[in-house]
């Protein structure tokens, strides 16, 4: 089975032996801090993917009519964001300020299914997230666009304890990712 959670909880679950594998997502600029932390805890890690976030919004959104979306187009929209401002050895307040800059309207969510439902039912919402499959976009009636302004590179990393050996099933799972 799998459990959707945030980076800090994923790390805690691995440390407490509640799971064998975890996936952690972070901005590439923090790569060294994360790797140092992983190594200090005896974790092994493998890069799954690197990506630049994309904008995702409902097909009924006014943004859907634009080929290029800029930050100014988002001013009157409601941002949906994940509540995961964790970076090892950096104060949470500093990360929150940098990763979630002040906006007039933001809804902070924990799970992806709630986020997808909100996007599909509220044309005033958007999220800046990892690329989403065509199947998922079609299922929820969503549109994806690249933000006109440059965005930060992000990484998704598989994480597991140093004493754990990946199984054939684990490898098959990673191939599917």
Where are these regions (language model features)?
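Short amphipathic alpha-helical coupling segments at ligand-binding clamshell hinges
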Residues: 165-176
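Flexible hinge/capping segments at coil-to-helix
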Residues: 37-53, 57-79
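A bilobed periplasmic-binding-protein/Venus flytrap-type ligand-binding module shared by bacterial periplasmic
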Residues: 56-63, 155-166
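Beta->alpha turn/N-cap motifs
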Residues: 6-7, 23-30, 58-59, 123-124, ...
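Beta-alpha-beta core module
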Residues: 39-46, 51, 107, 113-163
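Central regulatory/effector-binding core of bacterial HTH transcription factors
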Residues: 1-33
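Short beta-strand-to-loop elements that line the ligand-binding cleft
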Residues: 1-6, 101-112
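Secondary-structure junction motif
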Residues: 30-32, 71, 75-100
């Amino acid at each position: 089975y799998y459990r959707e959670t945030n980076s800090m909880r994923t790390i805690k679950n691995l440390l407490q032996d509640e799971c064998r594998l975890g996936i952690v997502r972070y901005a590439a600029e923090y790569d060294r801090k994360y790797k140092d932390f992983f190594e200090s805890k005896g974790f092994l890690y493998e890069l799954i993917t690197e990506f630049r976030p994309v904008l995702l919004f409902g097909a009924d959104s006014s943004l859907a009519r634009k080929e290029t979306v800029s930050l100014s187009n988002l001013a009157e929209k409601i941002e949906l964001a994940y509540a995961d401002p964790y970076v090892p050895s950096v104060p949470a307040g500093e990360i929150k300020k940098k990763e979630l800059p002040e906006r007039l309207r933001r809804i902070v969510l924990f799970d992806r299914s709630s986020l997808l439902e909100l996007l599909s039912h509220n044309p005033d919402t958007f999220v800046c997230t990892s690329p989403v499959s065509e199947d998922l976009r079609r299922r929820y009636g969503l549109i994806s666009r690249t933000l006109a302004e440059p965005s930060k590179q992000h990484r998704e990393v598989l994480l597991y304890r140093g004493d754990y050996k990946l199984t054939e099933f684990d490898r098959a799972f990673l191939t599917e990712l």
